[in-house]
Amino acid sequence: MASVTENELKSMTQEERVKALGMTSEQLTGRSMFMEFDPGETERFEYPWAPKVDFNKRTELDTVDMTSTEVNSKIRELMSEGYGTIVLKNPRGKHSLAVGILSKLNLIIEGSTGYFGVGLIDGPNVRINGRVGWSCGENMMSGTVLIEKNAGSTFGAAIRGGDLVCKGSVGSRTGIDMKGGTIIVGGDTGALSGFMMQRGRMIVCGNAGKNLGDSMYDGTIYIGGEIKSFGVDAVEAE
């Protein structure tokens, strides 16, 4: 890099100074690191590279002969082309489908998915017309996810925002380490639900298994049916 005098720097624009000094700049990414989001952050927040999509522009994708990686790459390609409503056909229990979507999108999955589906999302609305495996919606930041049937264990692990809804029953450790958002279960939930819960709310219309709310820091759990037992640090209230 050639030497630059102080007077030369003063006469340059900001962009010229950055280039002359060999500096680089890059967009900061990701959410705030606060335990709970600023209530207005979701509406204001967007990723600078997120594609602009048209919800009225709709397409279907048959995933029967595709790997999960290929499906996820194709979703991003379709979004870059402006598609705002995407229907995935024949998912056949594939793992890690629709992860890391950081943009507004209407996504409809016609069938069941495997482990870690729709994790790390920030913005999309997802409907799954089937069942889901373990850890659906893990680390979700915003958006909505609706599962028409049942879900496996660790449903909504570590979510920080958004609405995660399962019309059926879910497995154990629902909402483990959740830091915000809302989890709604139409049926029952298994043991250790709300384990190490920090914030947010969980609404279960049915029964809850053993050790509900074990090691909770904060947050609220509503149970419509019976509770098998409470965990350490859980406090019952009416």
Task: Label every PLM stretch briefly.
Residues 1-238:
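Long, distal/terminal scaffolding or interaction modules
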